[in-house]
Amino acid sequence: HYPLRRQRQMCIRDSFPNLSTGQIDVSTRIVNMDEGARADTNLEALAKLRPVFSPKGSVTAGNSSQTSDGAGALILVSEKILKQFNLTPLARFVSFAVRGVPPEIMGIGPKEAIPAALRAAGLKQDQMDWIELNEAFAAQALAVIQDLGLDPAKVNPMGGAIALGHPLGATGAIRSATVVHALRRKNLKYGMVTMCVGTGMGAAGIFERM
């Protein structure tokens, strides 16, 4: 229900446009929101889904991000280049950290990467005003939130990967853009992007609004 609620809030607030899309051998249709969140599901149906990785596991198709397409791009420059081309920055990239955990618990890599990024920036966790925690699976995102004591109100305020999709290779840029624009729109100071990576890695980066 959380992804669906976040998605509806976004559509109402930002007035998402209708886009015509075409697919090979499929008629054109109108798309005006992400397709991951399903309004026709319920807790009883979700509870009947089989675990994906382990017979007694908690990860199912119902609490995982969907296969999705997407693209994203960022421009990161030095202060020298900023001045040379008279550019106006949207944010400052404060720090970045990569850490790892045993592969069998790969989803909680951000648990180690977040404190490392905070140390590198000389900042405290409660100074983060907005946190984009990529939820490839709900279980790993919830584990990171619980273990680090993150404020749920600051985590994925506009919905995470289950609501909006997780296009491999683009998620980092998309989540970073989300943070930067949210900081500017809401006049906040610090934002963080963090995600798990296959084989146990975790990454986290901190942005400061300019």
Predicted features by range, described:
Residues 16-18, 94-163:
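Active-site pocket-lining segment
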Residues 6-9, 86-90, 125-127, 152, ...:
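Flexible, glycine/charged-enriched surface loops at secondary-structure junctions
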Residues 6-9, 13-81, 147, 152-154:
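N-terminal extracellular/periplasmic Venus flytrap/periplasmic-binding protein-like
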Residues 56-67, 97, 127-136, 155-171, ...:
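Cysteine-centered functional microenvironments
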Residues 41-108, 112, 119, 177-178, ...:
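Condensing-enzyme catalytic core mediating Claisen C-C bond formation in acyl metabolism
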Residues 6, 74-80, 145, 167-188, ...:
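Active-site-proximal alpha-helical scaffold in enzymes
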